[in-house]
Every structure is written in structure tokens, then in C-alpha cells.
């Protein structure tokens, strides 16, 4: 049963908080990011615009189901041993209030292992009106920044905006952080190889509508004289 508990901790991004270290690049195989056009055959109650598949999650599509739950004596755990599609999960299981599945700024989503590229960590979704309008994918920073950037270019093409910045760690080590934005007709992707600490990076994936909301929010928070 301990291995199942470990899977749950990994899915919720909790392993890093209890002292586990990310595997070395030589210890894991790189997996390609899956960013494909969504199936154009949609149900009648879905919006007609095309969505994007990213890490097996449809950005612009309906919210995925909750991860499979296994009931145990005195509680329950998520059973991710035979996960076939992405699903959402919550850290408090059924002990606390259920998460808001209509509108949520940070709902944890668990991709299937074959859709999780090496170097990615916790994935959270922005849910608007029951649909996934955005994804926030945390990464391990400098360790796989350039590999992830290459994979994103393979799937999305040449970035709309591209650059690099030098980041210095607390002990004086210097790292190169790739930065890129893909502003495409049906998806917006912002990749930051290193954010804050050198072992932390970020990928933001938004629908055009969500990107417009984010831009408006940032503009409203901008301070001036």
C-alpha cells in the first residue's frame, strides 16, 4: 500500500515538500510534450472552437473527471496505478469541502505518466464555467529548461517572442534561462525556464479568452503615479 501512497503524493506535487529530490537527467527518459489539436467532433453543448491537447489535457475543453478513488478502512486514497486519462485530484480527499468544479483558479490535474515530460512537476488548471481555460505547469528549473524548450518548439513551432536571461544562484552559480511566448490563434503558451529559485520553472498554457482575462487583470493591478 505504501507505493500507492507515494503515487498520490507525486500526483499532488507533495514529494518535493517532504524532502525528495528530482531525479538526475540520466536517470529518466525524456518524454515529448503532447500538444495536438483537439478532436473536432464535439458534443452539442460544447463551444465550437478548437481546443489544444497539452500533456493529455484539453485546454479549452471540458473538465476532466476526478481521479479513481479506492476506499480503505478509515479513509480513501487515489488509485493512480492504472490511470488511462488525465484526472483532477484534491489533497483533502473527502474529509474537507469539495473543490469548486465550475470556477477554480488552481485545481490540481494529474496527467497520465506517458504524457508527463521529464522535468515537469505539479499541474494545476484554471477552470471557468466547468471548462479548462488554462494550465499552470511547474518545472524543475535549470535541470531540464533547455530540453523542455526544445520540445515546445517541436510542437508549437517558432516562438512569437524568444530570449534568454542569466540567473545567478544563491551560491554564485550562473545559469541560462530560456524564455519564450507562443501567441497562436487558438492557444497562448508562456515558457519560463527559471522562475525565482534556479530549480523552479513555469509553463503557462491559456485559451485566447483566458489570456485576455489575465492581461486585463494584470493591467488593473499595474501601479502608476
Located regions from the model:
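A glycine-rich, hydrophobic loop/mini-helix early in the fold
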Residues: 96-128
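Bacterial N-terminal signal peptides that target proteins for export
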Residues: 1-8
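Intrinsic-disorder/low-complexity regions
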Residues: 1, 18, 38, 103-104
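Hydrophobic h-region of N-terminal signal peptides that target proteins for export
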Residues: 11-20
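Non-cytosolic coordination micro-motifs
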Residues: 21-98, 129-225
Amino acid at each position: 500500500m505504501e507505493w500507492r501512497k507515494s503515487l498520490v503524493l507525486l500526483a499532488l506535487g507533495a514529494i518535493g515538500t517532504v524532502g525528495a529530490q528530482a531525479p538526475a537527467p540520466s536517470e529518466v527518459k525524456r518524454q515529448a510534450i503532447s500538444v495536438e489539436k483537439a478532436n473536432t467532433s464535439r458534443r452539442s453543448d460544447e463551444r465550437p472552437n478548437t481546443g489544444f491537447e497539452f500533456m493529455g489535457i484539453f485546454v479549452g475543453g471540458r473538465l476532466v473527471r476526478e481521479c479513481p478513488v479506492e476506499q480503505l478502512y478509515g479513509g480513501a486514497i487515489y488509485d493512480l496505478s492504472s490511470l488511462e486519462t488525465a484526472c483532477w485530484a484534491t489533497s483533502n480527499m473527502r474529509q474537507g469541502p469539495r473543490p469548486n468544479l465550475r470556477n477554480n483558479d488552481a485545481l490540481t490535474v494529474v496527467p497520465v505518466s506517458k504524457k508527463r515530460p521529464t522535468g515537469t512537476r505539479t499541474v494545476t488548471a484554471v477552470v471557468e464555467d466547468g471548462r479548462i481555460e488554462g494550465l499552470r505547469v511547474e518545472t524543475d528549473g535549470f535541470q531540464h529548461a533547455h530540453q523542455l524548450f526544445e520540445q515546445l518548439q517541436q510542437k508549437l513551432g517558432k516562438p512569437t517572442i524568444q530570449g534568454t536571461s542569466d540567473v545567478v544562484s544563491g551560491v554564485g552559480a550562473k545559469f541560462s534561462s530560456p524564455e519564450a511566448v507562443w501567441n497562436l490563434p487558438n492557444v497562448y503558451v508562456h515558457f519560463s525556464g527559471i522562475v525565482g529559485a534556479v530549480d523552479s520553472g513555469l509553463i503557462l498554457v491559456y485559451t485566447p479568452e483566458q489570456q485576455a482575462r489575465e492581461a486585463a487583470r494584470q493591467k488593473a493591478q499595474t501601479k502608476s503615479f
